[in-house]
């Protein structure tokens, strides 16, 4: 049986509801939290999707904030999205260490002024973009070695 476009979209949406973090993520985030880092999510996802992912993975006490593109009505890598945490916390752009597995997002955050780190789990080659990451890690635990 062929699935309709709507059925495929619902199937994909349902899969996003049950995403689990990689094995080292929770422990690493807890260690960062104990070192008094403010931790936030900055995503193209919707607030309800992101909130459910955080709740379903028992990460509610780890993240200080969840920023969604819905707050500004435009997708990353538009600079309005990257402004969200800067404006909320009244901090300088270069005070933020921004991590992403997406090269376009690393580049967008870096061009905005963040210190961007590429989470390159598959040891890919960074896309030929106009920004090179501050650093590259292969899993989140490596972040503890560079901060």
Predicted ranges, named:
Residues 1-12:
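Single conserved hydrophobic/aromatic residue that forms the stacking wall/gate
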